[in-house]
Regions:
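N-terminal, positively charged regions that mediate nucleic acid binding
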Residues: 45-85
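Conserved phosphate/anionic-ligand binding catalytic regions in large, soluble enzymes, centered on
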Residues: 53-55, 59-64, 157-171, 274-298, ...
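A short glycine-rich, hydrophobically flanked beta-strand micro-motif that places a catalytic Asp/Glu
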Residues: 82-86, 204-210, 263-267, 333-344
Length: 425
């Protein structure tokens, strides 16, 4: 039933008029008011918007993530068996590194942090956070032997309890939801432009609202929001023109979209954004878990990724869940798929596996769940082996994103044909 026909099934009598500027109809004979369902735009009645955000590598929380993952990489480069749980806090010219690290590697944690800060672009002392002026303190000790008992190579159990989710859908070539895919592409391009435009600074954000039809298919981009730190002398008109033409337009074009079709574009909507980075907001490892995954499109188990070696199923389990979900969608067994894994500390096999295809599956969710159990090794040791996770590959995920990024082992679709064959399709 169309919105305009919700109440009025017959032509409106001549004595029924609408007050100018009102959304109500008046019956001149009765003085009654009726909601103006007739003139409400059908588009607005049916609109379904979903919004996701992403942040640049210079965002305070991402600075912390990247330091933690760079320390993890430095340990794995020398000792692939390193056990790392590294947390970082950054604020005005201060960086605290803490956590539990058991490794044979010899790593200068402070030197790693200083290099990361420099690489991100915080080199100007005037920013209130720079590689030269930052004070760095380390409070690191070894992993608890109680935890190590259940996660050693002989036992191969999970490093903690918890549930992890992975998802995929056919909205983009990388099989990611469109809102987070565009948001991440915008922030990655912003980061590139910071290196090219000396009046831009490292801290920034992007947010994208996508309109979906009644069947859940994306129709287009409704709203784009971009905020980027800048120098004091950068005229706002010039900044907005630069971001619109050099960042937003090319990214939309990559996804087959046109800038003119976006209903709302907001660039630095509050105006001035000079104070930023860790000088503007304190950053902590693991505080951008929705940015790191699917922008809220799929569920999240609550565990962060950065600073954790692959025996921590918060990270490796989520990577495996993405790998399995992506292969299901790549096999055209579903248009949209979420995989949930759950583990008990010290236990190798997951305590539960669940597939949800939101009614888009070509076979039942129960059959897909069994196919995953028959096809993939979901033990922590099996995940590490399958995805080759004992390598220094993690700082890049903190910088560019964990999912939908080419070259990651958990982004391969090498099991799609096998799954399709096993499903009998």
């Amino acid at each position: 039933m169309k919105p305009g026909n919700l109440f009025f099934k017959v032509p409106i009598p001549a004595y029924v008029t609408r007050d100018e500027g009102s959304c109500f109809w008046r019956s001149e004979s009765r003085g009654a008011f009726f909601m103006d369902f007739l003139v409400e735009k059908e588009k607005n009645m049916d609109r379904k918007l979903f919004t996701s955000e992403c942040v640049t590598t210079g965002h305070p929380d991402k600075v912390a993530d990247r330091i933690s993952d760079s320390i993890l990489d430095a340990c794995l480069a020398q000792d692939p068996g390193s056990r790392v749980a590294c947390e970082t806090m950054v604020t005005t010219n201060f960086c605290l590194i803490a956590g539990e690290i058991t490794t044979k590697a010899r790593v200068d944690y402070a030197a790693v942090a200083r290099r990361v800060i420099r690489d991100i672009g915080y080199t100007d002392p005037g920013l209130g956070f720079s590689d030269r002026d930052v004070e760095i303190q380390c409070r690191v000790h070894t992993q608890s032997p109680d935890i190590a008992l259940g996660t050693n190579d002989q036992v191969g159990g999970a490093g903690d309890q918890g549930m992890m989710f992975g998802g995929a859908c056919n909205e983009t070539p990388e099989l990611m939801p469109l809102p987070i895919a565009i948001s991440r592409a915008l922030t990655n391009r912003l980061t590139e432009k910071v290196g090219e435009n000396p009046r831009l600074r490292p801290d920034g954000k992007a947010q994208v609202s996508v309109e979906y039809d009644e069947e859940g298919k994306p129709m287009g981009v409704d709203t784009v929001v971009v905020s980027i730190q800048h120098t004091e002398d950068y005229a706002m008109e010039d900044l907005r023109a630069f971001v619109k033409q050099e960042v937003i337009a090319p990214v939309l074009k990559d996804y087959g979209l046109d800038l003119s079709a976006v209903e709302h574009i907001y660039i630095n909507p509050t105006g001035k954004f000079v104070v930023g980075g860790p000088d503007g907001d304190t950053g902590l490892t693991g505080r951008k878990i929705i940015v790191d995954t699917y922008g809220g499109y799929f569920s999240h188990g609550g565990g962060a990724f950065s600073g954790k070696d692959p025996t921590k199923v918060d990270r490796s389990g989520a990577y495996m869940a993405r790998y399995m979900a992506k292969n299901i969608v790549a096999a055209q067994l579903a248009d949209k798929c979420q995989v949930e894994l759950a583990y008990a500390i010290g236990v190798a096999q997951p305590v539960s596996v669940r597939v949800d295809t939101y009614g888009t599956g070509k076979v039942s969710d129960e059959k897909l769940t069994q196919l995953l159990r028959d096809t993939f090794d979901m033990t922590p040791a099996g995940i590490i082996r399958t995805l080759d996770l004992r390598r220094p590959i993690y700082a890049d995920t903190a910088a560019r994103g964990h999912f939908g990024i080419q070259g990651k082992t958990w982004e391969k679709t090498d099991k799609a044909e096998l799954l399709r064959s096993k499903a009998g399709l």
